[in-house]
Amino acid sequence: MTDGGQSAELRSFSGLLVLVGAGKMGGALLQGWLRLGLDPKNVAVLEPQPAPEISALAQRGLKLNPDPKSLAGVTAVVIAVKPQIAAQAVPALALLVAPSTVVVSIMAGRTLKFLATALDRPCALIRAMPNTPAAIGRGITVAVPRNASAAQRALADRLLAATGAVE
């Protein structure tokens, strides 16, 4: 279990994190990561209708809607899209995924099996379900791993802890 406090600090994260979908929950995660010290230069956001505060982060180095082909060495992908667009969105992410990549999904109603089939690549998968208070940093998220090492699970927990406790 990880709490939303200092144990989840992200200042030391030096990889590339791709957030797919920056609506209510994805945006809450992003704001939490930045609050915990994540450098915007380490983040790419794929969001067709970004909120003004997310667009403004591009001034601080956040990569907003880059060509996914230009993103090399992705450490983690967090999928926060609506489930109804998952069948289109998730397979397109396969080019970002390597065996060392951690893929975290907070999509409602989409299983680990769906993710594995849609990505069709070996990678660490984490299926997570945050509750509504996560949108204000006071949530509890249940996370279930598949093919994830202890270090990959720890990274996923650190990312998810930006909005509250993780089980």
Q: What does each of the following model-derived ranges do?
A:
Residues 18, 108, 149:
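Short, conserved glycine- and acidic-residue-centered signature motifs
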Residues 29, 55, 60, 64, ...:
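Rossmann-like NAD(P)(H) cofactor-binding subdomain of soluble oxidoreductases
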